[in-house]
Amino acid sequence: AHGEHLLELGAGAGRNTPRYTGYDKITLLDYSRTQLEQAHAKLGDSPRYKFIAADVYRLPFVDGAFDGATMIRTLHHMSDAPAALAQVRRVLTGDATFILEYANKRNVKSMLRYLLKKQDWSPYTIDPVEYLPLNFDFHPAAIRQWMKDTGFRIERAITVSHFRVGFLKRAVPTGLLAWLDSLAGLTGNLWHLSPSVFIRAAMLDQTPAVQNTTKPTGGLACPACRAELEDTPPEIRCPGCGRAYEVKDG
């Protein structure tokens, strides 16, 4: 995808960030300041990057701030996935592209384990399963419904990690296994049977959630009262509610 300003949700230490060569600017967002400090150390002080420590349920951006977003290896930590997706939609323009990865509960391994009575939760029920604290697997049908309800239209799906089984990793050469995995991923538009699924989505309508006629500037907004903020280090003070947000080491 190509565009002006990408929002990388759950950016962590910036491992994936260099891959997004099609965007002029990238805002890395993560709940962990420590992770963002690692990303900053890796990516440097380039004006192309902005580093924001924030809560995905209260994104600190104006409506329609970005024309692209990614959320990879992140949704599975969300106890309220629809609320998180709604926030993502709010900050995207009408022509944006959204890349989402989710953990699929209805995968072959979980179905076999359920059949053999080695797990007590069903991979077929629509509700998420919390297999560890704040670690969720989701049913594909639930993801499709949530995406539609929050204003996204799924364009393509790719399944990955089909062969996440110990004996296969030991018995089959890594290169061959990766090739077979990429081949199997082409069936993603037909069925989701792998533990991890990538989705490319567009917007259901071609306008932001709230009309925004400006370009995707990545503009900041107070997460408490939604007033627009000026990026004025070393402290950003909200003109609406008076809250102050610290700018520390970039």
Regions found by a protein language model. Give the residues of each.
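A C-terminal cap/extension of S-adenosyl-L-methionine-dependent methyltransferases
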Residues: K117-D120, Q145, E155-L220
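Class I SAM-dependent methyltransferase SAM/SAH-binding core
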Residues: L7, A11-R58
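Short cysteine-rich clusters marking metal-coordination/redox-active sites
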Residues: C222-C225, C238
